[in-house]
Each structure stands twice: as structure tokens, then as C-alpha cells.
Amino acid sequence: MQCEFFIQKRCTSCHQCAQPYSQQVENKDQQLRELIAPAMDVQWLPPVTSADTAFRNKAKMVVLGAAHAPILGIEDAQGQPLSLVTCPLYPQPMQELLAYLENWIRIAGIPPYNKLKKKGELKFILLTRSENSGQFMLRFVARSHAVLERIERNLPTLIAAFPTIEVVSVNIQPVHMARLEGEEEIFLTETQSLLEQFNDVPMVIRPKSFFQTNPQVAEQLYATARAWVREIAPTQMWDLFCGVGGFALHCAAPNTAVTGIEIEPEAIASAQRSAQMMGIDNLSFAALDSAKFSQSQMSAPELVLVNPPRRGLGSELTAQLEALAPQHILYSSCNPQTMVKDIAELASYQMSRVQWFDMFPHTDHAEVLTLLVRK
């Protein structure tokens, strides 16, 4: 990937982008083999690769500069504001909207928040784009309600210029610390969610719900998990850490009932709405802690799918899974290091199949899907 920001050493987030993408994939595959299955008889499937540019559906921009010259991007290594509105990770429609927003913020006279002086209002711009519809969800993260009047007054101009903006909200984050968002979300549009679609499965995205940032690869991840589950054909399964229900919605079938568990109520609301849109009646969701849910169960279904955050399952949940003894565990991980640690604690299981998905090109990160079978 040709990136001027990287060449100038002003942004090094994509620290591998100087390497040809094919070489990145080869190196990552070798590293993951050595980490996950160095001496095991495991079916290692070819990786699912990504486009090397224009693959992200979400931008998180710090609002820098001053009201008369706002900048959306980051601070570089020297502490200087760097506009990233033309970052090659973003599709052209996102780049165009981000560039327009820089000028729109200036015209609206909204002062960026200055973390050193603890003055100003606008902290972040969070932009999400539906790959399926091309529509946007735009969130302004502000220090206080003082910014609302200027945003509302100038919003018609913004939406007239970009009618694909479907959802607009203001998130209030009053704390002076490195926190992306606060508790209060104020919607400025009637529509409060964005609709995505993977493999003919509708996915509802709300402001605070986690959603994969590489939709083309995520679609293949969900399709692969569905295919593996259908090979097993369980009558019941759990989807722990289910988020907005991507795996559960794909895996539910007339003969497979799925229970999705996620601690974030907003994500569960999204998952439930998707299930209603699909007309699925053997799919249920609950806003619960996955470990506490497992602890409350006397037995497990034939298959448990887990998709934990970067910290992994943790000893409490791995111990519960050992005791509940499902025949299969399907583990999707964004952190292979913690996944390997968790699998070591699942002593009654052995890896049967592994495939990784390059959700994060130009970095060391990968999404890994592993099928574990009880010995």
C-alpha cells in the first residue's frame, strides 16, 4: 500500500504497509502457525485475505486544530496535528465526507477540544458506513451540551450535501481523559441505527455496538462459521459474547436453536431486531455476562461458540466450559495470544481445524477461527 503518511513517518499505525501485501500474509501465516499449532496435527486452512486499501467501514478521528482551522486525524510523533481524511484505508465516499466535515466544522464555528488547555468542545468524529447501502452513521463526541445548538443549526447543510447520512448523534463525554465516548447519546435524526447486510443476513448497527471494521472479510468469517456449524448440525448452541448477533444470526437454522449472550444491552437490542427482520423464532438473546450465564447453567448444548474481547475468555469461563463439557467449541479470536492461553486451559479439547482472516491488513493482528473437539 502506498501511503504518504507512513512514508513521511507521521502515521505508523499500519506499520507493515511498506511490505507487499502478499508478503505480509505469508509472514503472518507462518507466525500464526508457530504460535497456534507448532507440532499438532491440525487442519490448517488457507487464510482469507483482504483488499489492501479502502476496506475499513469505520473512522475514529480526533478533532484537532482550532475553530477556524479544524483538523480530523491524529497527533503525529512530534505532537503536531495530522489530517487523515485521505487515509487510504477508507473508501472514497468516506474520504469525501471526512474532508467535507473538516470544512463544515469550520463554517459551523465549533471549537475542537484542546486537551492541554482543557478548553473547547468537539473531541472526536466517529463515522461508520454500511457496505451494503452506502449509508452513514455520524457521531459527534463533545465535552458538553454547549455544542448542540451549532450542530443542529448547521446539520441541514451537511445532510443536503451528503444525503447518504442516515444517523446523526451527539455523544457527551465530559471527562478529561482518553475515553472515546460517554454515557449520554443524543440523536439528531429520527433513524437511530444503520442497516448492514452480510450473506443475506441483516445486521443492525447502533452507536455503541461493536461491529467488525472490515466488512468484506467479516462476511466471509460469518459464512465460514455457519458452514462449520452446519457440518456439526447441533440441535442447540450458545453464542457467547455475541455482540450484535453476527454469528448467531448466521448459524440459526430450523433444526439449530441458538442462544446469544452479550453484556451490552444496546448490542442485544440490535441482535433482537435483526432476528425479527429475519423471522427467526428459535433464536434468543439476553443481555448478560457470559461467565455468569455459563455459571448458572446445569448443562451445555452440543456446540458453544465464543467470540471474546482481546483479553480472551479468562480462567473462570474456561473452567466452566471444561465442567459443562460441550462436544464442540468454536472459538473466534481477535487476539491469538490469549486464545492459545485459553485453549491450554481447555485441557479436555483438541484443535481440529484452524483458519485465519486478515481483518487488519498492514498490522500484526488477525482474526482466527478455531474448532475444538472434546477428546
From Swiss-Prot:
Gene3D superfamilies: 2.40.50.1070, Vaccinia Virus protein VP39. Coiled coil: none annotated. It comes from the Bacteria. It catalyses: uridine(747) in 23S rRNA + S-adenosyl-L-methionine = 5-methyluridine(747) in 23S rRNA + S-adenosyl-L-homocysteine + H(+). InterPro entries: 23SrRNA_MeTrfase_RlmC, MeTrfase_TrmA_AS, SAM-dependent_MTases_sf, U5_MeTrfase_fam. The active site is at C334 (nucleophile). S-adenosyl-L-methionine binds at Q212, F241, E262, N307. Its EC number is 2.1.1.189. Belongs to the class I-like SAM-binding methyltransferase superfamily. RNA M5U methyltransferase family. RlmC subfamily. This is 23S rRNA (uracil(747)-C(5))-methyltransferase RlmC. It comes from Vibrio cholerae serotype O1 (strain ATCC 39541 / Classical Ogawa 395 / O395). The gene is rlmC.
